[in-house]
Swiss-Prot record:
It comes from the Eukaryota. Ca(2+) 3 binds at N262, N264, D294, N302, D354. Residues 161-723 are extracellular. Residues 774-800, 862-883 are annotated as: Disordered. Residues 862-879 have a biased composition (Low complexity). Ca(2+) 1 binds at E171, D227, E229, D263. This is Cadherin-2B. One of its GO terms (biological process) is neuronal stem cell population maintenance. Calcium-dependent cell adhesion protein; preferentially mediates homotypic cell-cell adhesion. Cadherins may thus contribute to the sorting of heterogeneous cell types, and thereby play an important role during embryonic development. Required for proper neurite branching. Required for pre- and postsynaptic organization.
Length: 905
């Protein structure tokens, strides 16, 4: 009994069922015969209704390659009506009614590598319209047997393993589950009670329970829809055991392939694709590749994609500017006319469709391709003017004299737009250069070498503008790419300059003052300004020279001396200044170098000038050298001689060793301790020669191990005049300082005594604490003790004052120093009259304000942070105040109340 199956299931599971209907199925797959490549049936049958729809599956033809993994391609003999996919499923190519003539056709299978060809016949049985059969076009469920064979001895031997064709199950199957796929049985089930089972992924391994088997009947079923994108195939093993669990058959392998269905829509890797192409590209130029993927089997039509362009925006130059390879997704140009100046960007809508691009039953998706038209140098730069003007002061460098402006239609800030300027004429000496401003693309004409107005006052430059990249082929430069620059040089006051500078002259030393040396003159480059030049001395270290301010004549002011400290390597340098009369005046410097020729003006002298020898010298000779400030030929070789005096000079002799060296030898064996001054007469080789007698100071000392240990007393020596004068000056200065100190001390004592005589003991406050809280006793200007003024020398001592009366600022009571008695005071009457007259005059003075009068202060402004101190103001009239409250103060204030109450009394 057959249960209802999905529409393709019986066909996919009927591989062996068809074989078992034929004679000897075992011979086809078992026994000694090997697997044969080809269709599993000679004729395939399908039962369908007359009317079919495009894409409707009709049946499945099975082809086996015996596991050799051949690449098989299928085709029908009537592709107009029927087509076949890579899994062997036959579909209707169009919607039509099948005629009897169309009900039979051939299916071809060809090896793509060897081109070997197989074919099989397909016969379609037309069903009546009222018939409803759940197994349309399919056979009954396949049955797979565990087959054995007995030999002549009655022993069983296992047959060779079967090659079981795969079981194909479509994914996403609908219907009632579980759905039976195949039946597994053994020939021994007639005699034994067997139990069947399956193992492997999908059965007892994850995912567990996808496939189940009836342990008694052997029906293998699938329990749920399959998804090829998750698992494309399952490898199971079928087992047969008896009720005791003993294996009665060897396991057989079962492969279940999940047949792909078109359940995945193509997906582009990017929703927006960006590409670029240079403008002016020829048709057929590659732009970019767009790619989409499909989750379905890429080897089947479900996963085979086809591309096409749905739209192009904008449709300028050509509505079909681009095309796409429908299989690879390569976008190429189809038409000419790409111009960035017209269209900078194209937007394409790309569609990818599976089922090999079938628009009816294929799934599709879209993406956007943005193609930027990149710039090429197809527009030369053009100057905005034919002539540009500029001016520059002479002798200025790194100055921009003119701005050159150009226009370029190419894309800004690209090599095709960036301008490069060149000077092609009018600047033979290379005094100008043109730099490009990176932002504005302007050309900056710059002076790179000084320009002399007196040499050339106007420059006419010819310049051209180009780009960083060459123009594309076929584009020529225009006349507007060349321009003229007129540069005017402005005359400025320039520095005078000496020529030659430095100036070298040769002169013998010893030239006296007021002698002319040379003329050192300067020139003014501003020959059109008619200016005068004046000269002055800038540097003359030895102050030997002066220069005439008008004509530059240099004369000496002192004797030139080659041996001066200011002369280096016989050369003396002086610097002079030349200043013109321009506004502002400009100046330049020049150096005069005087090479001084030597004359014999320096006598030679002995070196060293002091030596030490032992009293018994060994050797008894002293090496000496003659030095001369002059140079050859006015120096060596020298002549060394000893004079005839003093007498002890006879103990010595001198012998010349070379032109500059000699040896002073002692004729006797020893000398007494002391210091000996040996005169040596030396003559140079100058013409005329110069000679000099210099003294060699020889110190004779006691020696230990050939070194002096003690110094002998000085013989015939004493203090020099300079030393004696210095000692006397020191003594005089010391005595003067002592005398000045004594005088200052005496004067200070006298001043101290004079101060003590003038100080009154009563007024000597010093550092005592003053007490100022005594009040009363009348006015101090009237209450005074006249007796103190009359006889100050007879005032009472402090001891007779009452206790508590003595002021704190008075001296404490102790013995006071005795001072000389002052002269007698004037007559007391005179002092009293003087004081009384002054007091009377003060009292009668009408201009003197009384102490209790209202003081008037100057107005110092408002806004004091301390506020106003005059909070009580006088009323302008008596009626403005109410003084009735004074009557409530009692009888004591009655008089005050009467005064302010306005009473008539």
């Amino acid at each position: 009994m057959c249960r209802k199956q999905p529409f393709l299931l019986p066909t996919l599971l009927g591989i062996l069922a068809a074989l078992m209907l034929q004679q000897g199925p075992v011979e086809a797959f078992g026994g000694s015969r090997l697997c044969k490549t080809g269709f599993l049936e000679d004729v395939y049958h399908a039962s369908v209704y007359r009317s079919v729809h495009e894409g409707q599956p009709l049946l499945n033809v099975m082809f086996t390659d015996c596991g050799t993994d051949r690449r098989i391609q299928y085709e029908t003999s009537n592709p107009t009506d029927f087509r076949i996919d890579g899994d062997g499923i036959v579909f209707a190519s169009r919607t039509f009614d099948i005629s009897p003539e169309q009900a039979e056709f051939l299916v071809y299978a060809q090896d793509e590598d060897t081109r070997e060809l197989w074919h099989v016949t397909v016969k379609i049985t037309l069903r009546p319209p009222h018939e409803h059969h759940s197994h349309q076009g399919f056979h009954k469920v396949r049955e797979i047997k565990f087959s054995t064979q007995r030999n002549s001895n009655g022993l069983q031997r296992q047959k060779r393993d079967w090659v079981i064709p795969p079981i194909n199950v479509p994914e996403n199957a609908r219907g009632t589950f579980p759905q039976e796929l195949v039946r597994i049985r053994s020939d021994r089930d007639k005699n034994l009670s067997l139990r069947y089972s399956v193992t492997g992924p999908g059965a007892d391994q994850p995912p567990i329970g996808v496939f189940i088997i009836n342990p008694i009947g052997g029906q293998l079923s699938v329990t749920k829809p399959l998804d090829r994108e998750q698992i494309a195939n399952f490898h199971l093993r079928a087992h047969a055991v008896d009720v005791n669990g003993n294996q009665v058959e060897n396991p057989i392998d079962i492969v279940i392939n999940v047949i792909d269905m078109n359940d995945n829509r193509p997906e582009f890797l990017h929703q927006i694709w960006n590409g670029s192409i240079p403008e002016g590209s020829k048709p057929g130029t590659y732009v970019m590749t767009v790619t989409a993927i499909d989750g379905d089997d890429p080897k089947q039509p479900n996963g085979m994609l086809r591309y096409k362009i749905l739209s192009q925006t904008p449709a300028i130059s050509s509505p079909n500017m681009f095309t796409i390879n429908n299989e690879t997704g390569d976008i190429i140009t189809l038409a000419a006319g790409l111009d960035r100046e017209k269209v900078q960007r194209y937007t394409l809508i790309i569609q990818a469709t599976d089922m090999e691009g079938n628009p009816t039953y294929g799934l599709s998706n879209t993406a956007t391709a943005v193609i930027a038209v990149t710039d090429v140098n197809d527009n030369p730069p053009e100057f905005t003017a034919m002539t540009f003007y500029g001016e520059v002061p002479e002798n200025r460098v790194d100055v921009v004299v003119a701005n050159l402006t150009v226009t370029d239609k190419d894309q800004p800030h690209t090599p095709a737009w960036n301008a490069v300027y060149r000077i092609v004429g009018g600047d033979g000496t290379g005094r100008f250069a043109i730099k490009t401003d990176a932002n504005s693309n302007d050309g900056l004409v710059t002076v790179v070498k000084p320009i002399d107005y007196e040499t050339k006052s106007t420059y006419i430059l010819t310049v051209v503008a180009e780009n960083q990249v060459d123009l594309i082929r076929g584009i020529q430069f225009k006349p507007e790419s060349t321009a003229t620059v007129s540069v005017t040089v402005i005359d400025v006051n320039e520095n005078p300059y000496f020529t030659p500078n430095p100036k070298l002259i040769r002169q013998e030393e010893g030239l006296f003052a007021s002698k002319m040396l040379t003329t050192f003159s300067a020139q003014d480059p501003d020959r059109y300004m008619q200016q005068t030049i004046r000269y002055s001395k800038l540097s003359d270290p030895a102050n030997w020279l002066k220069i005439d301010p008008v004509n530059g004549l240099i004369t000496t002011t002192a004797v030139l001396d080659r041996e001066s400290m200011y002369v280096k390597n016989n050369m003396y340098n002086a610097t002079f200044l030349a200043t013109d009369s321009g506004i502002p005046p400009m100046s330049g410097t020049g150096t005069l170098q005087i090479y001084l020729l030597d004359i014999n003006d320096n006598a030679p002298y002995v070196y060293p000038q002091e030596v030490e020898i032992c009293e018994r010298p060994d050797p008894n000779a002293i090496n000496i050298t003659a030095l001369d400030a002059d140079i050859n030929p006015n120096s060596g070789p020298f002549i060394f001689e000893l004079p005839y005096s003093p007498m002890d000079i006879k103990n010595w002799t001198v012998t010349r060793l070379s032109g500059d060296h000699a040896q002073l030898s002692l004729k006797i064996g020893s000398l007494d301790y002391g210091i000996y001054n040996i005169p040596i007469h030396i003559t140079d080789s100058g013409n005329p020669a110069m000679s000099n007698t210099s003294y060699l100071r020889v110190k004779v000392c006691s020696c230990e191990h050939e070194y002096c240990s003690t110094t002998a007393p000085i013989i015939g020596t004493g203090l020099g005049t300079g030393a004696i004068i210095a000692i006397l000056l020191c003594i005089i200065i010391l005595l003067t300082l002592v005398l000045m100190f004594v005088v200052w001390m005496k004067r200070r004592d006298k001043e101290r005594q004079a101060k003590q005589l003038l100080i009154d003991p009563e007024d000597d406050v010093r550092d005592n604490i003053l007490k100022y809280d005594e009040e009363g006793g009348g006015e101090e200007d009237q209450d005074y003790d006249l007796s103190q003024l009359q006889q100050p020398d007879t005032m009472e001592p402090d001891t007779i004052k009452p206790v508590g009366i003595r002021r704190m600022d008075e001296r404490p009571i102790h013995a006071e120093p005795q001072y000389p008695i002052r002269s007698a005071a004037p007559h007391p009457g005179d002092i009293g009259d003087f004081i009384n007259e002054g007091l009377k005059a003060a009292d009668n003075d009408p201009t003197a304000p009384p102490y209790d009068s209202l003081l008037v202060f100057d107005y110092e402004g408002s806004g004091s942070t301390a506020g106003s101190l005059s909070s009580l103001n006088s009323s302008s009239s008596g009626g403005e105040q109410d003084y009735d409250y004074l009557n409530d103060w009692g009888p004591r204030f009655k008089k005050l109340a009467d005064m302010y109450g306005g009473s008539d009394d």
